[in-house]
């Protein structure tokens, strides 16, 4: 088992409880979805909602988008994510 209180995590008891509860509540499909990232330029809320609800993406990567578009897309992705989405630029 991973020691979540040790380096590099340094989580407290409340954070560890959140991790354990979240993982326990996830379906196998949701866990597999966390392995996948999307390089997306779409900014449609309907499209992004569908990505999160159908594929349970673990992250999103950006490539040359205007800052306001990135912020808007992040807001939408996080809104529909069960687990916070990892964002990379």
Regions of interest found by a model, annotated:
Residues 1-89:
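N-terminal beta-rich core of secreted/periplasmic extracellular enzymes
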